Amino acid sequence: LTCLPQVLDTVGPQHVILLGHSDGASISAIYAGSIEDHRLWGVILIAPHFFTEPFGLAAIAKARTDFEQADLRDRLGKYHQHVDNCFRGWNDSWLHPDFREWNVSDCLDYIRVPVLAIQGHDDQYGSMAQINEVTDRCYAPVDMLALTDCRHAPYLDQPQATLDGVSDFCRRLADINV
């Protein structure tokens, strides 16, 4: 809750729609539910995590095996200068025994801006229960976009549907806030 406000203050936007994917979606939701920021018009949560699920942890354990024994390290290396630090920071955190009880769902109770929650039905790291948690707990209006034939990266598996959903949501927020 200290870094994101500093980034926003430095960049200096007057109006913000936070968009986060995976752990970034969790960060966006935590911010929206914890900080009263009048610049915030809405939040877009793509494949968010609010609690751990056994099958998701199993997929993260499989990712560790793929990183150590298959080609995942090479594939990620195209996107990350320090691929080992990046992967281990994520993977080791999620697989730490203390993390099994991790739950940040309470932040959803305090979100007071519109939310778009996007989830793939075939997400290997999180089930539809993640965005159902959003619709069940958020006080603010929530749009849900549940995509078939879609895993953890809707913008890759269903790019047009994801872009259309995000564009429509942003357009509607602009219309009501201008």
Segments (PLM) and residue ranges:
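Short beta-strand/loop motif that positions the catalytic acidic residue
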Residues: 111, 117-119
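A catalytic-pocket lid/entrance helix-loop region that shapes and gates access to the active site
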Residues: 56-81
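Conserved acidic catalytic loop of the alpha/beta-hydrolase fold
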Residues: 1-16
